[in-house]
């Protein structure tokens, strides 16, 4: 949590954990991630990314292998959002630190952006040679600059907040 340095979230294969004392003690906070009777077998507990909204510290997003979840009460309860992306394996997520309510997701079918806190989504794959995106980061110095790592097609860059992507030159080992 960028505004409350003592609050930390961690996504694991067993769900989301929260610490309120700088990682001294961790508690599971999975209420609403999956129905209790499916807890042991659900892919929703396999959390691949957790991001806190920089404008609303009680709003947290959890990307899972079974879709996207959101809490607005500091992880007391979760709601599944983004039904357009239902059951999608999300492997990376960015909550934009400049554009309020903007969230980016990456997975096997590319990159998606929501500008309304996860209610609606737009696919933003123009320029990507593959849709299998494995990592996604926003530049610390330029909020419109993003990098996406793919499975098999290398690294891509977007200079316009994901509207278009261009392949980066191959990285080679120069010994």
How should each PLM-predicted stretch be described?
Residues 1-175:
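Extracellular glycan-interacting surfaces
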